[in-house]
Amino acid sequence: MKSGLSFSFVLKNLWARRLTTTLTVLGMALVVFVFACVLMMTEGLRQTMAGTGAYDNVVLIRKGSQTEVHSSVTREQARLVSILPGLATDSQGNSRAVAESLVLINLPRTGGEGNANVVVRGTSAAGIGMRPQIKLISGRMFEPGASEVIVGEGLTRGRLGIQLGDMLNFGARQWRVVGVFSADRSGFESELHADRDQIMQAFR
């Protein structure tokens, strides 16, 4: 009897203070929603970073640099690294060390909605081969010595919408999109890849 009266009293009290009750419930729901969003974002970042790296690949950057974009290594330094003992070799016994160049460019979004930052990776067939998650899904590889790029699948969607055959303007020249690649949802899918020497000439 007392339990029934207490429960009835609680219900009446909640109804009498329905505004406070509603705000409390909404506040708790908002906290749960934000917490769930943070967890989902953290998991997404973890999967992206895990897919981008590899246990048997080492990235060498300049002392004090935190990212590839902010690093600078000379050709001579890269050559010295390539002859260090203990590096993986191919079937001919040549070092599998690969020198790459990385630049950050601005590309216009569709509909005139400003620009987006995009990473351009100057690499080679050997560099692509060191990342087994990268697979060409349409078009072809860029030709060494040509102003050609292949584009990550992530850049073909959304507001950039880069498509096979498009002409991109950066580095004081035009570049033709000759291929589209996937990379198992890793960070590489948000990059453009081109011939390293051509990228270095365009941004020297």
Q: Positions of the model-derived regions?
A:
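Hydrophobic secondary-structure segments that place a key small or acidic residue at a functional site
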Residues: V98-L104, A116-A126, P132-Q198
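N-terminal Sec/SRP start-transfer signal
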Residues: M1-F33
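Alpha-helical membrane and juxtamembrane elements of multi-pass inner-membrane transport
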Residues: G4-S8, L23, L39, E43, ...
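Short, small-residue-enriched loops and turns at beta-alpha junctions
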Residues: T22, T67-E68, R185
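Hydrophobic, regular-secondary-structure patches
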Residues: A29, F33-V119, S138-R140, G145
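Glycine- and charge-enriched low-complexity intrinsically disordered segments
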Residues: I199-R204
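Membrane-interface junctions
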Residues: A16-R17, G51, A183
